[in-house]
Structure formats: structure tokens, C-alpha cells
């Protein structure tokens, strides 16, 4: 970053020192199959209200969407990119969430693979045809550093396997179509436990803190 760019970034910073040019796009998944109430849909739909209630600095810098658990997730991603606030933002962080019934921790996913497996629809295929099935893309965020900053809030681990269902699908699409194509976009995926493991308020607070932590780190760059 040259001196002119750094000066311009400082001029648009918020009074609290955070970067006003970083917009967060938070996505969760809708109900599907045996999951009638998806934890991530509730978090996505309730996050703006939570940020308002807690007077978070991010309240005016977030867009949210609950998306279908299907290949339509790719269309939803493209739709989000056409959001006027996303278009005008200087930097955008896509934070995708998925539900993991078996985990008792928050799982920060480091990477996604070029493979989709949907047993219900008898579907197995590569996501991007100019890459191999075993190819993977990694987030540009330092997941180990994020884990260290988040582990005091709730048990947090770094995962290197987002499985091959639609969590992996949306993450790979996001990394391939957005983060790889433009420095404006960065992507991260978070697997969350059920509300039975970590209640809704706890999860709201965790996700909000994760975004604020990312915001802090990006402000240092």
C-alpha cells in the first residue's frame, strides 16, 4: 500500500478507528430436509437487530441473507454482489455460516474443495470444470490467528475439511468466483453448533465478535 492509499484509508476510518470501507456480508442456510429450524438462518436474520442492540460499530456495515440449501446458493451469491452497498464498498468480507450437528465447537474452515456431493438429489460433480475434483482453495485469512483470538469466547477450532455438501459448495464458489477474482472480496466459512450446544445469544455474540476481530485485523493492513 503506498502513502497516498494509506492516507485515504485513514481519512475514511470511523471515529473508533475501524475501517469504514469494510462491509460484511453474513450468510446462513435455510431449513432443509430434517433440519426444520436452521441455526444459521436465525443468526443471519437476527444479526442486524443484535448489532443495533449492542451498539456495535458494524451495525451500518453489514448485509445478511439466508440462502437455499441447493445449487441456488450460487445464484444467491451473485445476487448479493449486485447489492448497491456491496458494489460501492471498498472491501467486502463474505462470512458464510453452516450448521454442524456433531460439533461442540465453532469451526473456522480454512479451505474448500472442488466437489459437491448431494445424496438426497443423487448428485456428485465438480463445482468448477476447469479444476480437478481434488483441488482446493484456501481463505486469505489467517485462520489460526483468528482461532487464538476467538477461543476465549467459546471453544474454537480450525477445520481443514468442510465436507462436500452445500457448506463446502458455497465456500468454494465464494473463494473461486469472488475472492480469487478481486482483491476487494475476502471469504471465510464458519461452522456453528446447534442452539442446544450454544444458545442463540451466545452464538450471536460469537459471530459479532468474529466480525469485529476480522475488522480490527483488516484495519491494521
Name every feature range the model reports, one short phrase each.
Residues 187-194:
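A structured phosphate/pyrophosphate-recognition subdomain
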Residues 2-165, 175-184, 205-206, 212-220:
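N-terminal catalytic or cofactor-binding beta/alpha core of small enzyme domains
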Residues 198-205:
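A short acidic/glycine-rich loop-to-helix N-cap element
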Residues 31-32, 194-198:
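A generic structural motif
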Amino acid at each position: 500500500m503506498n502513502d497516498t492509499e494509506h492516507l485515504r484509508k485513514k481519512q475514511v476510518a470511523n471515529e473508533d478507528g475501524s475501517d469504514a470501507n469494510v462491509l460484511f456480508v453474513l450468510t446462513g442456510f435455510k431449513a432443509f430436509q430434517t433440519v426444520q429450524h436452521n441455526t444459521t438462518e436465525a443468526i443471519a436474520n437476527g444479526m442486524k437487530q443484535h448489532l443495533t442492540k449492542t451498539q456495535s460499530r458494524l451495525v451500518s456495515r453489514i448485509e445478511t441473507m439466508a440462502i437455499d440449501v441447493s445449487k441456488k446458493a450460487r445464484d444467491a451469491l451473485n445476487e448479493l454482489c449486485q447489492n448497491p452497498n456491496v458494489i460501492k464498498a471498498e472491501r467486502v468480507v463474505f462470512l458464510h455460516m453452516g450448521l454442524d450437528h456433531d460439533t461442540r465447537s465453532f469451526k473456522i474452515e480454512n479451505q474448500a474443495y472442488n466437489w459437491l456431493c448431494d445424496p438426497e438429489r443423487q448428485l456428485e460433480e465438480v463445482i468448477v470444470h476447469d479444476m480437478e475434483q481434488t483441488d482446493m482453495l484456501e481463505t486469505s485469512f489467517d485462520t489460526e490467528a483468528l482461532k487464538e483470538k476467538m477461543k476465549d469466547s467459546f471453544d474454537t477450532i480450525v477445520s481443514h475439511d468442510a465436507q462436500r455438501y452445500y457448506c463446502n459448495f458455497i465456500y468454494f464458489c465464494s473463494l473461486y468466483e469472488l475472492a480469487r477474482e478481486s482483491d476487494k472480496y475476502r471469504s471465510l466459512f464458519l461452522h456453528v453448533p446447534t442452539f442446544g450446544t450454544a444458545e442463540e445469544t451466545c452464538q450471536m455474540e460469537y459471530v459479532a465478535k468474529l466480525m469485529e476481530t476480522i475488522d480490527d485485523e483488516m484495519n491494521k493492513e
